[in-house]
Amino acid sequence: MTLNDVRLGTFDGSNYNKGAGLIKTILWYFVNALIVRASWNPFMGIKIALFRAFGAKIGKGLVIKNNVVVKSPWNLVVGDDCWLGESCWIDNLDKVVIGSNVCISQGALLLTGNHDYTISSMPYRNAPIKIEDGAWIGAKTTVCPGITVHRNAILTVGSVATKDMEQNGIYQGNPAVKIRERKIKE
């Protein structure tokens, strides 16, 4: 090993604040695994109540499908009339704010955490995600840390948002690029 090699054994996570104490974090782990994510639990009201009990701020009319993962509900804000599709993953080591009338499709990944690869111990490098009203995050997409998805923007199936997305923009690819404007009819 040379002086400039990666040394994961020196990673300690000290630059990361979970936003909740150890007991709350452990309790959420079990509640999430046994009740919230469980395929036997089709009851959205129970899931929403548990998210709120653990600190999530959720508006009215949330539709939440099975196997949705929320790592830290205390770092989650969701507006009114939103959809969280089956198997979407909200990896919110930092704050995730979702506006109203937002669709997060099945298998989408909202990723607020990463590592600083320029430092040998690879400490966390986290940043919040903001998804504004009317946006649609397509199936099997990834929204990277620090991204703002502006009002009514669309991230198409399988795409990766590595930069902010303009209002009414439709984005596609890896990295996602704007391919056209979204026009909404009444």
Task: Set out the residue ranges of the language-model regions.
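Flexible, glycine/small-residue-enriched loop-and-beta-strand segment within the central core
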Residues: A38-I48, V68-V78, W83-T148, N174-P175, ...
